[in-house]
Amino acid sequence: MRFAFGAGGTGGHIVPAIALARELKSRGHECIFIGNASSMEERLAQKHSLSFFPIKVQKLYRSLNPDNLLFPYYLAGSILKSRRILKDEHIDGVITTGGFVSGPVAIAAISHKVPCFLHESNSYPGLTTRYLSRYLHRTYISFEQSRPYLPKAKLKNFGIPILESVRDTGFSLTTLGLKDDRPTILISGGSQGSLAINSVVSSVVGELLSSGWQILWQTGSLTYKQFYKQHNGKEGLYIFDFNSELSNMMKKVNLAITRAGAMTIAELEAAALPAILIPLPTAAENHQYYNALAQKNKGVAELLVQSELNPQNLLATIKKVEPDKLRKALLALPANTATEQIVTDILSFY
């Protein structure tokens, strides 16, 4: 059978799609990817040998933005083009995993009477998911907190699909000039980075290093040069904007300080890595806060809201956190078999 994926915008939406596509391909099925041209989804699809078909999708901004005037035009065009792709490529099923690309692809599938499946990573489903889920064959959720917002008869909770590389690695910190036997913190605000997190970390990095921590600090691309110039060369510190081994680093550190995107949380769980979660306050419908709150309530992470983020509070939270206790709770979680379970369930419809 042939499946089409629609996802885009961020790695948190795209990586689950890649994981599901790889699993489907391993079972003998063919997969294509639909998304914006010259985008992260195009780069990742090509990296994993998935045929890519571009459409023009524009994000609908929640604030007053003149670009919103063009949204209906681009939406109609992207739906029509997606329908043509589904027809020309003889697609048997469509799988969407979020991001503004997923809406037009899902609508095209529904209108073309192609079975459609959606995976929602976040604990609070977005408007598109809440609207489309009633028309889908199945909606897969990752948090039990999502259930009240979606049609219960079509729901399955299998968790978040992750790539195999997160689960098993022989990676060593010595390749970064650090030691494998020292307590290590991973700090990341995402691929672009977080100025709020980076600025506070910049103020406390010296104290953390002097207290015995090693630090892996992903500044992100936007402020990398600024913080690299300030801190590069300090013993026990590896500072970088992007590293393809990031998911493997998680297996070698004792504590993470990160945002609370759903994909990040899934990778933290897969690596059994305790974390201090700092939700992005501008995330749609504040979903990162609810993601982080769910993790805190499970006893596997600490929550520090950005409005309370300052050098004193960050240091106090690091000192307060009990990594061994959190790791024990993480290890007690069921193994992540979301990818396999979702694919098996999808194939049961055929």
Spans of model-derived segments:
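Donor-nucleotide binding loops and adjacent catalytic segments primarily
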Residues: L44, H48, F171, L178-A256, ...
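An aromatic- and histidine-rich active-site surface loop
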Residues: S39-R43, G93-H112
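A short, well-ordered alpha-helix in the C-terminal region of glycosyltransferases
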Residues: D324-N336
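Conserved nucleotide-sugar phosphate-binding/catalytic loop shared by glycosyltransferases and other
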Residues: F3-G8, R27-Y74, F158, V305-S307
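An amphipathic, basic-hydrophobic alpha-helix
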Residues: L64-G93
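Acidic donor-binding loop of glycosyltransferase active sites
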Residues: I91-G93, K251-A266, L273-P274
